[in-house]
Structures are given as structure tokens and as C-alpha cells.
Amino acid sequence: MNLKKITKTALAGLLAAALAVGLAGCGKSGADSAKSADGKKIVTVAHTNYYVPYDYVNEQGESDGFEVAVMKEVAKKLPQYEFKFVPTSDDDLLIGVESGKYTVGTKGIWITDARKKKYVFPKNNIGASVIGLAIRKDTADKIKDLKTFAQFSGKIVPIAPQDARYMVIDEYNKENPDNQIKLTSSEAFQVADAYSWVLEGRYDGYLDVELSYKNNIAKEDAPYHQFDDKMAYVRYKGIPTYPIFNKKEQAFADDYDKAIEELRAEGKIAELEQKYFGESLSDYLK
């Protein structure tokens, strides 16, 4: 019997087995039941690293923001989990939660039908963002809301159908069949174009998230601050924002729901809204 040949065969078998185990391990998602030293399930909370005041990294290099703060309060309510916060980009968050790299993600997300196919949405929202119209200042005395905008002209900058803002105008039109906004679809364009089209009179309004308007125009260091003296913003309503969970994390989403309901009843959510926004954005959901 050739001992050398047997040894090589055995070694090859061991390597194959080790490789199979390694591949099996790689097939498991990061959201699958990792345990800490004390037996708690580790959950990774991805959040955007720039979206002040919702989700960002502060000057001390720490995860911060309203939604991050809420999730940290949720963590206190759920001692069976160990929360790890990971600041990242928009794309990595969305892809990572879908693939299981992250357990849950927060980035001021609205519900859409397309997103519901990829993620678990909890029953309870985490917060809200305000949506409204960027208009010319010379029309501000006539345009006070969507109804008066529709009466004025209804000429709104086109919106891509997959954009959650399209749904906002579509719902308004369904509720107001006799006072429609001229909703047309478009592909993506630069936000500077939208503001320019409104200023030129090509359209009379651009549906914009208030925070985006502030960051793009209202702030002194905003990239399009030169438009500030010619444009105005009209609030419409609040849109609920949600954390998104990996599809395998329904149980964790259910636990989140219980915790968030307790926090809301205790007034903690309202307290954090005042801290980060200076007002209750939840009031705009009513």
C-alpha cells in the first residue's frame, strides 16, 4: 500500500471538507442570529452618515441623529439584543439590509410598494419628514398649499414614478378629482434644474422635502443659496419614516414595534423631536 498516496488523498479530503464548511458559513447573512458573549442576539443598525438631523456622524465620530437616538432608546427596551450602529452610504445601507449584511437600516425612509417587496416594514413609524412645494416668491401670496397650487396652475416639475414623491401627488389627485395637479413622469434630473425651471416659469412648483430645500437653498452655505431671495417654501404635510428590516427579521421588527409604542406613550419620541428638530414633526402626520 502506498502510504504517501493515502496521506495525500486524506489531506485532499480534509481540505475539501474545510472548504465546504467555509462556503456554508459565507452563505449565512450578517443578519442571521450572531450572538454576543452573554448570549444576546447581535443586531447591526445601519444608518446614513450625513443626513443631519436624522442620521449622521457627529464631531466626536459617534452615530447621532433623531432616528439613531430613537433606535438607541429602542435598544434600552430590548435587552435581549445587542445593538451595533454602523454609519454608511445610502446604497450600502439599502443593499446591505436586503442581503442581510445589516439587520436594520434607517435613513428617513418612506414606504413604497417596491420597497415592501425587498424589506420588512414595521407597523409603527420611527419619525416623519415634511414635504412641500418650492415656489417663486412672487407667487407666495396665491399658493398656500396643494389646493391653491392646483388652482393657480398645477404645473409641477415632473417626478419619476418610482420616486415616493410621485405617490404624494397621485394621492392628492385621487382625493381632489375636480382640482388636479398636472402630474407627469420623468427620468432623473439634477435638483438644480428643478429650481431653475421653477424660477424660469416653466413650472410653478417643485415637490421637495423640506430638509432638502433647507440644505440646498435656505442655508447660507447651501449650494444654491443664490436662489434664496427668489424662492419660497410651502409646507404640505408630514410623511412617516420607517426603519427597514431584513426579510428574515420579522420577529425583531415586532419587538421594535412594542418598544416604539412604549416610547411614544412615555413621551420619549416627542422629547427627541424637540431636541433634533425644535418641533414635533409628528403633528404634521395628523
Language-model features: locations:
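A ligand-binding cleft/hinge motif common to bilobed small-molecule-binding domains
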Residues: 92, 98, 108-118, 168-171, ...
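Short helix-initiation/N-cap motifs at beta->coil->alpha
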Residues: 84-95, 183-200, 212
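Periplasmic-binding protein-like
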Residues: 49, 127-132, 221-257, 279-286
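Bilobed "Venus flytrap"/periplasmic-binding protein-like clamshell domains
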Residues: 45, 49-52, 64-76, 132-191, ...
